[in-house]
Each structure stands twice: as structure tokens, then as C-alpha cells.
């Protein structure tokens, strides 16, 4: 398997190495594995093609990793550092939106560019009017369960209000999260 990954990298570089938008590469997304191996792979990638920036993983939940860059990382993709959160999810669970804070405290001692991983992902109430649009394997069992639950509780008439209110909240949370990132001088970017 490991040799396949090295070979796959070689094929990617051969096919896309000169593409102008190929400027960064991660070994994978949310990897939980042997980080010595991942660092070795990044070292190999840098030796093979040094024209771009590399990172071991686009975030990880692996214990002992993910709060600071790995030794071979040219950039760091995470939800938090060892100093705190760099994405709203962990902050907005603890405090209300305030629109004047940033992520500077969590960025202290960061020696490579940092990108916040998968910001947002705020839940919005489903639009139950869309149920009939789904057919075949796309049957919206989750939407149907929500509809049945609302009907059982006598709240079905509120479904559109729930949709609108949750959508407005998601907009406010995205707005603050993106503004916090943009206000943080050391911040390098974010992924939606």
C-alpha cells in the first residue's frame, strides 16, 4: 500500500506537475496513521518536486498530532492549535458571536502558513417542500423523519420558520467566522 502511494504521487506530478494551480499538496484528508511514514512521504515529495508546498495531512484527529505542524509541513491545516481554536465551531459552542475578535491568540508561535480546516458546516433545517424532488436511491429518509416528527408534535406549520431562522443563523456564524479569519494578521486562509 505504501509503495502505491509513492507511485500515485509520481503519477500525479507527471500528469499535473506543470498545472499553474497545483501549488499545494496534502498526503490526505484527516489522516490517522503513522506520522513518521507521512513525514517520510512529504520528504520524498519535496525531493521529487520542490515547486509546491506540502503537508502531511489536511487536519487529523490522531492523538498527539494536529495541534501543531509536523516537522516536514510547509503549511498547516487544522481546526485548532495547541493555543486554541482557529475555527468558529469550537468558539461559538462556548460564547455568543461578538464580531470584534480574531484568532491571533491561537496563532502564537506558528512558523508555517496556517489554513483553517472545513470552517462552518452549520446545520440548517431541511426544506421539507423538497421531499417530492428526491426519487430512487435519493429517497430523503431524513427529511421524511423530520416531517413525521414535526407532525407528531404539532409543529409542522413551523417548518418554514425553522428553515428561515436556521439559515439566518448559519449566515451570521459564517460571517463572523470568515471575518475573524480575515482580521487575523497571521492567518493564511480557510477551507469551506
What annotation goes with each model-predicted range?
Residues 38, 85-86:
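Extended, low-complexity intrinsically disordered regions
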Residues 74-85:
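Acidic, His- and aromatic-enriched active-site or binding-groove loops in soluble protein domains
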Residues 63-65, 83, 135:
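Feature targets compositionally biased, intrinsically disordered low-complexity regions
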Residues 1-74, 109:
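Active-site mouth of glycoside hydrolases
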Residues 25, 86-90, 94-192:
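Substrate-binding clefts and catalytic carboxylate motifs of secreted carbohydrate-active enzymes
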Amino acid at each position: 500500500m505504501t509503495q502505491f502511494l509513492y507511485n500515485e504521487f509520481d503519477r500525479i506530478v507527471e500528469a499535473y506537475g506543470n498545472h499553474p494551480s497545483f501549488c499545494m499538496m496534502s498526503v490526505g484528508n484527516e489522516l490517522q496513521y503513522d506520522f513518521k511514514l507521512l513525514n517520510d512521504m512529504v520528504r520524498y515529495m519535496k525531493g521529487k518536486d520542490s515547486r509546491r508546498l506540502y503537508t502531511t495531512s489536511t487536519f487529523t484527529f490522531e492523538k498527539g498530532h494536529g495541534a501543531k505542524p509536523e516537522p516536514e509541513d510547509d503549511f498547516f491545516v487544522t481546526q485548532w492549535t495547541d493555543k486554541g481554536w482557529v475555527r468558529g465551531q469550537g468558539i461559538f459552542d462556548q460564547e455568543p458571536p461578538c464580531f470584534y475578535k480574531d484568532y491571533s491568540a491561537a496563532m502564537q508561535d506558528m512558523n508555517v502558513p496556517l489554513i483553517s480546516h472545513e470552517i462552518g458546516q452549520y446545520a440548517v433545517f431541511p426544506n421539507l417542500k423538497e421531499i417530492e424532488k428526491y426519487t430512487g436511491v435519493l429517497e430523503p429518509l431524513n427529511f421524511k423523519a423530520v416531517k413525521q416528527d414535526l407532525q407528531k408534535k404539532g409543529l409542522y406549520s413551523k417548518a418554514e420558520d425553522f428553515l428561515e431562522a436556521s439559515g439566518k443563523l448559519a449566515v451570521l456564524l459564517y460571517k463572523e467566522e470568515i471575518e475573524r479569519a480575515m482580521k487575523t494578521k497571521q492567518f493564511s486562509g480557510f477551507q469551506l
